[in-house]
Each structure stands twice: as structure tokens, then as C-alpha cells.
Amino acid sequence: ALRQAADNAGELQAVLDRYDDERRELAEYAVAATWGRVARTGAGMDSVEALYRELPGIYKWQFDSAQLARGRRYAAMPLSVTKDAATVTADYLADNIDDAWRLWKGRQWNRELPQDLMCEMLLPYRVGDEPLTRWRKPYREWLAKLEDTLARCGNSVEAARIIVDRMGLCHYNDRLSTPHRSALDLLEAPIGYCREDCDRVLYAMRSMGVPVAVDRMLLSPDNGGSHQWNVVWDNMDRRMRMFDNENYPPTRDSLYYDRRRKGKIYRSTFAPDLDRLARYRKAVGVPPMLLNPWLRDVTAEYFGHNRAEVAIWPGAKASEENAVYLGVFAGQRFQPVDIASLKGDRAVFTDMEPNLIYAPVMADGKICGYPFMLRHDGSLHSFVPDKGSYEKVTLTRKFTPGYHQKSRFSSVVGVHVQSAPTARGPWTDLDVIDTPPAHSYRRINPDNPLTGRYLRVYADTMCKGKYGAEISMLLACRDTLGLDCLPLSVVGDDAARERYTRILLPDYSLE
């Protein structure tokens, strides 16, 4: 870090020289952690922040079409990259070290928190590549009314729950791809997706002395996307407790499960995990996400240690350079989430979620062995096709509906679909959705021929979804297969026509 600091090396050295007590080790850790850390800033990000502050609008916390176009233009603007080691000041690091030290020594629940965990869960001055800010005091002032309650609290999980109850939601909006937002921007405008929600939780918890981190899956076996959540160190049994600020509050309930299949789980770290990176040292063409130095494999904390040894097809020509990876099915193919060690013509995988189908793959995702499942009892089942026996099946769904999918399905409960001869009515129910649909579509076959020219979709009470009823498309067809569609137009003012035409009519074009 001192070499990377160049002309700023004096600032980093000043931090080290400031301490001659236990804080010296924290200072060494913080200085070392500046290695490779950067902030990404620019006029485009400033404009994105201004855009977030225009919400909520008529679409609640979602952008309208004009805002989204602006946001994507801003997000594509060039960014400036500044290295922490070359720019951070001694005062900034020292203030962070002193504050984290005070909370480590002062909170009841931190009395047995090991120093290595303290350095990763209380000490960090940053989360990702956000602009650096002095965030600890503003967050503590925001949560100041909780201080007396927290002072009496002896359990870190309970302290986390108290803070979560005060924080409220981070309003969901995942339409823009940007660097991490700054701590103060998240405090002022809590908007984003799971990343922003987790970042905001980290700042709040650490400002009050609660040891927390972020765990993540790089690729979801359920939907192919990534996801992250928070964990809090439980001082009662010295283990991590996962929680989701919005849906699953911190709890010591050992039966807690968020219903997501995960495959492999990594923890975001403050200092780089060089031991994990060493496994990829000789491999060629490693997927970039696996070379993130600030990830640590913590799958065993969730599922225990396990091991699977599978045969590799001879044609794969596997070697340390042409490495084999653990593949989870995501995005219509198996994709790498961890590297294997080779044992002759076999690949050895360790620490994975049981009862999930994996496949050995090469760096490009090409399968190099039969898919397999490691069961809870440690037994291994390989899916070897029997070409002498065939059976036809009808596949309607690869996975059971996940949390978000169930939420979207249930959002339409209470919706009426009606017809009328005029735009003013009288309206007649064609269908009332009283239970969540089993699929992402609903087909309505009227008992009698329709005589009304107008259709209306509405809910007489607020639907259960975050944004009301979530309906993406509306078709009126002459046939039952949805091939012979009738032309539709939207009745209403300009705003209604703009919004609902985009959402409901599949042939609508912006051009």
C-alpha cells in the first residue's frame, strides 16, 4: 500500500506513527486495506444522484421513460478513478480507526469479538468503489434516539434488529448500473436494489458498533442473477446470522431460511483474500468475477464442509492452466462459480450447497463432465444419460417460484377485468383474480360473446405488490392461442396513454 501511495505515502505512514497501543494493529490493517481500493466519481454520477432525488414520482420509486433515458445517459458518462492509497488522508483514517475502536471496546456485545472479525466488520472505512465520505457521525446522529436502548442491549443480533426497525426500507429501483453510491447519498435518498440496501445497513450498523458484513451469491441457481444480503456476528454463539433488511429481520431463530438456493456463497471483505486468489494463479482465462480480490468463500458457514469428486471427460484436456470449474445453471447454461482442484482425470469440488445440480465446466462454461448432485448425507449422484431408455415428460417449470416471483404473482390478487359498451360503463366482471396465478399469465375465456367495446383492469382495494398490481401485457384475441390479436388503444389523458400503452400493448414502439 505504501508503494502504491507514491507521494501520499507520508499520510499513510503518519497513521502508523500515531499509535503505540492496540490500535497500532488496526492502523496497520486499515493502511494495508487501502491497496487496490478506488473511488469512481464523475459528473454523470452527480446527475444520477439528482435524478434519484426526483423520486417518488407518479410511478412511485420507478423512473418514467424520460427519467430512465436520462439516467442511462448519465450512467454511461466517463468516470474518474482515484486510488485510496494515493489520496486518503491520515486524519480520515485515524478518525475511522478511533471510532471503530471506541465501539469495539464500549459495546457489551463486542466484548468477545475477535480482532480479525473486528477489522472486517467494524473497522472498514469504505464498502466498495463509492466516493469517500465521513459517514460515521451522520449515521449515528440519524440513529441517536436508539442510543439508550442499545446501551442496555447485550446481544448483537437484537441490536441489529433494533436498528433495522428504525431504518425503514431502501426503495427498490434496479434500472441503472452504476458504481456504489456514497454513504451520505444513501442516507439522504435510500433508493436502489439489494446492493444499496446492504451498503446502507453496513453504514448504519457499523456507526453504532454492530459487527456486520455482506454475503452474496455471484450467480443465483434460481434465476441466474446475483444477490447479496447482510450478516451479523452473534455474540451468544459466535456465528453469523443472515438477514434481509426488508423481508427477514435479524433473528437468532436457527430455522430461519430466506428460501433462496445459493450454490456458492462469498463474503465481501475489507482486505483482499490472497489465499483464495492463489488457487487461480496458473489458470488461464478465469472469469473476471472470480478474480475479485475482496471475496472470501464462506459456503461452509451455511452448509458445512463437504466434498464432491467427479470424472472429467478425456476430451476436455483439463490442466492447471485449462482449469475446471464448478458450474451452476444460470442464464440458459452452466456458469463457473468456483475452481476445482484436479486429481488425475477427476475434479474435486469443496464446500457447496447440497441437493443442487451442478456440472463441471471450463472457463467458457462448456460442460466437461456429467452433471451431478451432492446430497446432504455426502453421497454423490451423477446424471449419466441412459440412451437405451426414453420417456417423454411435459416440463412446465424448472424451479419452484422464488420469493420475488411469488410476490409478483400475488400482486394481482383483487384485480377485476371488466367490459362495458361505453367508456363510462356500465361495467361487467369478466374475471376477478382471487388467488395468486400459478403462471405468469392468465387467460380469460368469457362464457358469452363480448358485446362491450371497452375493457377495464382495476383493483377495488390496494393490491399486495410493492407497486400495486404488476401487469406487463394485455392482449385481446379472437383465438385461444393468442395469435389473432385485436387492436387496442388506451383511453385517458396524455399521462395515462403514455404509461399504459408502453406497459400493456406489445406492438407499441418508441420509434
Named regions from a protein language model:
Residues 278-306:
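Beta-strand-rich domain onsets/edges
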Residues 321-340, 417-419:
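Short amphipathic beta-strand segments in non-cytosolic proteins
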Residues 306-316, 397:
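A short, amphipathic beta-strand motif
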Residues 363-390, 474-479:
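Structured interaction patches on ligand/partner-binding surfaces of diverse proteins
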Residues 1-2, 148-166, 174-184, 189-284:
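Hydrophobic/aromatic-rich core segments of domains that either
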Residues 390-511:
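Aromatic, loop-rich ligand-recognition surfaces of beta-strand-rich domains
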Residues 3, 7-189:
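Secondary-structure boundary elements
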Residues 345-366:
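Short Pro-Gly-centered beta-turn/loop motif in secreted/extracellular proteins
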